[in-house]
């Protein structure tokens, strides 16, 4: 291995470290903005507020840093491949021929594991959280970004792909379908999935205060709609919220409906209904 080769590899490893540190800093700022908007969502309606524009720029930075990290990682892999000896010989070659299929599976696992290692700690934790959702019901947005309205439904997680970061879900009750197509599956990005609070752990569940806008399962359906909190489970001494759903007007007024706390989640930023 020549000195120039070593120098090039070391320079790229330093660049990789810098990119990861920059990503950590950007993610910290993104989390700060999320907390700010969750605490005071009405702030975006104030004249001159640039919170959403700032958040968008932060996501653009995060995306660029992530793409640069992938580029540098690929360069490093190429540099290392060029320095490694070509192929095994003798006993090694015969052994690899016997276990080629097993090694292929191992390489696939290693690729997924290395992808996770390159991610920030917060993103790794998020990926583990989504991987643990298999078999559970979640809220899923099944409409495209370009759609006029967001449609959210209760679905069941059947698989999480760590490599593509996609969640495969099953809509067990697709609604009234004249063709009777039955259950339907979707592959959705993580951003389209909202985990529900744990039914058996109400004490560790975030409670939304009166007046807060939320996304909740409409009684008797598997669809979620925007609603306003009227009363909390704690105040009602029960496990249900008292909510008023948008566009649910009856006789000139919005009826108040009860919804279990484990079917209520935070309203996504930019929700369209």
From Swiss-Prot:
Residues 171-173, 220-223 are annotated as: Histone H3K4me3 N-terminus binding. PROSITE patterns: SGF29_C. InterPro entries: SGF29, SGF29_tudor-like_dom, Tudor_SGF29_rpt1, Tudor_SGF29_rpt2. Keywords: Chromatin regulator, Nucleus, Transcription, Transcription regulation. The record marks 218, 225 as: Histone H3K4me3 binding. It comes from the Eukaryota. Residues 128-273 form the SGF29 C-terminal domain. Belongs to the SGF29 family. The SGF29 tudor-like domain mediates binding to methylated 'Lys-4' of histone H3 (H3K4me). This is SAGA-associated factor 29 homolog B. It comes from Arabidopsis thaliana (Mouse-ear cress). The lineage of its organism: Eukaryota, Viridiplantae, Streptophyta, Embryophyta, Tracheophyta. The gene is SGF29B.
